[in-house]
Amino acid sequence: MKKHILCIGDSNTHGLCTDPSESADHGSRYNEEERWTCLLQKALGEEYLVIEEGLSGRTCVYDDPDMDSVNLLPILHALLNSHEPLNLLILMLGTNDAKTKFHTDPTKIAVGMQILVEEAKSVPCWGENEPKILIVAPVPIEEGVIYPDFNEKSVETTKALAREYAFLAVAEQGDFLDA
């Protein structure tokens, strides 16, 4: 049986391309030859099944009044149940949690990620086969690239997520990667 890897994230996991001229297909989403999840699948080979679960705007625990259904927390159990069995759960979120409207900081975002990790561990379908969890700090927002929902504090917040997530991974006995 193949080993199953579920990748849950935001636009980075979805493959959003904000400049269609950068995409091979000139579309708003990178194609299967460009998305990191597809590249991971290709690198791992046929013994693995990499499942994409990316949504632009997705947050760890915040409801966004301007975007429907982007809060992962209320749907996490359903996603995990629908994709089980899993060998590895990859969570790469936090960028959208740094939006100015949420008035947050790196520690609060890490607490949101911790809630997700603990919820993921509590899903009854695992039994004794709980998947490993990899917490990935997303690439920080670049300085000077400020979208309407982000400001300089958002840039600094996303830069500090790697440190917070590394501590969290140790506390939760998970793994960590700084993208």
Language-model segments: which ranges?
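Serine-esterase "nucleophile elbow" of acetyl-processing enzymes
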Residues: 1-55, 61-65, 78-83, 89
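Alpha-helical cap/lid subdomain in secreted, periplasmic
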Residues: 2, 46, 70-179
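Active-site micro-motifs of SAM-dependent methyltransferase domains
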Residues: 13-14, 57, 97, 141
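A general secondary-structure junction signal
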Residues: 54-57, 135-137
